[in-house]
Swiss-Prot record:
Belongs to the GrpE family. Participates actively in the response to hyperosmotic and heat shock by preventing the aggregation of stress-denatured proteins, in association with DnaK and GrpE. It is the nucleotide exchange factor for DnaK and may function as a thermosensor. Unfolded proteins bind initially to DnaJ; upon interaction with the DnaJ-bound protein, DnaK hydrolyzes its bound ATP, resulting in the formation of a stable complex. GrpE releases ADP from DnaK; ATP binding to DnaK triggers the release of the substrate protein, thus completing the reaction cycle. This is Protein GrpE. GO terms for biological process: protein folding. It comes from Pseudomonas aeruginosa (strain ATCC 15692 / DSM 22644 / CIP 104116 / JCM 14847 / LMG 12228 / 1C / PRS 101 / PAO1). Residues 1-20 are annotated as: Disordered. GO terms for molecular function: adenyl-nucleotide exchange factor activity; protein homodimerization activity; protein-folding chaperone binding; unfolded protein binding.
Amino acid sequence: MADEQQTLDQQTPEQPTGAAEDLTARVQELEEQLAAAQDQALRMVADLQNVRRRAEQDVEKAHKFALEKFAGDLLAVVDTLERGLEMSDPNDEAIKPMREGMELTLKMFDDTLRRYQVEALNPEGEPFNPEQHQAMAMQESASAEPGSVLKVFQKGYLLNGRLLRPAMVVVSKAPAETPPSIDEQA
């Protein structure tokens, strides 16, 4: 009987050890699954925040630039009014009331465009900027810095800081060196 008791005593500690190892392994496995689930949940929350942020940015851009096509179409009207004022004689008494009406209409257009963040680009005298200007011609000039805008054919416009239409300009270049004449060489 003592032998049996000793055998049972030897087996009893092994069984709990085996069961404890199984439980420890199971706890570790469950902890790993929990950590993976928490990580996945954090990633999903981050993805959801990113989607929400992108959607808010898209809505903001849509609000900012919804007027882009409409504003672009109005620029032709502004250009026509400006050309009409340039072509008409301010001293001609017969058209003076019409000129005043055109000036007031143009001022109203300019004020309205500014209210909706449409900003005119009139770069005369400024350095040429290919991101905002379109060079229509180059002209030699001794008085202007090479690479600067000499004349503006058509003003450009920005809508909320983004280019709506480039300014069409004439860009200065350095005068060509004239070869010395025969008289100067002699």
